[in-house]
A protein has these predicted regions:
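Repeated loop/turn-to-beta-strand initiation elements of outer-membrane beta-barrel proteins
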Residues: 4-7, 63-66, 111, 115-121
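Outer-membrane beta-barrel translocator domains and adjoining extracellular loop/strand segments
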Residues: 19-27, 79-85, 131-138
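Residues that define the transmembrane beta-barrel architecture of outer-membrane proteins
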Residues: 3, 48-52, 99-105, 139-145
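Extracellular loop and loop/strand-boundary signature of outer-membrane beta-barrel proteins
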Residues: 38-42, 90-95, 131-137
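Predominantly the C-terminal beta-signal and adjacent terminal strand-loop region
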Residues: 114-147, 152
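Transmembrane beta-barrel strands of outer-membrane/channel proteins
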Residues: 9-13, 68-72, 121-125
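Residue-level signature of outer-membrane beta-barrel architecture
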Residues: 1, 11-13, 58, 111, ...
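Membrane-embedded beta-strand positions in outer-membrane beta-barrel channels/transporters
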Residues: 42, 53-55, 94, 104-108, ...
Length: 153
């Protein structure tokens, strides 16, 4: 890994259903989707979503890579729900027309231990937006840490 810094911005848009009453399902369906669609510590799937996430990545040491980002999330269609990674409804629309789903600051550290072995940790904190508050009364924030080790042949 090279030492240095990098700034990046991600903008993802995945369609949502514009009219739940018609027979056309317009919600984006990522067939065989990965749980890491928009990060290794992901709460929601890529259906009916808009994500804007600036991130800074730097290498404080030769085998160490750290990144910090702040993701902002909106619903692409106010007539559609929020979906989990396999595509199931997590937060139904319930007639709520707010788009703002929330924001999630996150930090990730990757450490290359040997040529084949690496260790990783990702920390995320989720703030609920107006949509969750009005749709299901979710006013509490959520945080979690996901550590893992990778061995590559």
């Amino acid at each position: 890994m090279r030492r240095g810094r990098r700034a990046s911005v991600v903008l993802d848009v995945a369609s949502g259903d514009q009219n739940p009453a018609d027979p056309n399902l317009e919600t984006f369906n990522a067939l065989f989707q990965s749980g890491t669609y928009s990060g290794r510590a992901q709460l929601l799937g890529p259906s009916n979503s808009i994500r804007f996430e600036p991130t800074v990545t730097f290498a404080p040491a030769r085998q160490l890579l750290a990144s910090a980002g702040f993701g902002f999330y909106w619903r692409q269609s106010v007539f559609d729900a929020l979906y989990g990674i396999p595509g199931q409804v997590v937060v139904p629309s319930n007639g709520v027309t707010d788009r703002y789903e929330g924001c999630r600051p996150n930090v990730q550290i990757d450490w290359q231990l040997t040529r084949h072995l690496s260790a990783h940790v990702n920390c995320i904190y989720a703030f609920n937006g107006r949509f969750e508050e009005r749709s299901v009364g979710a006013t509490r924030t959520m945080s979690y840490v996901s550590p893992w080790v990778t061995y590559r042949f």
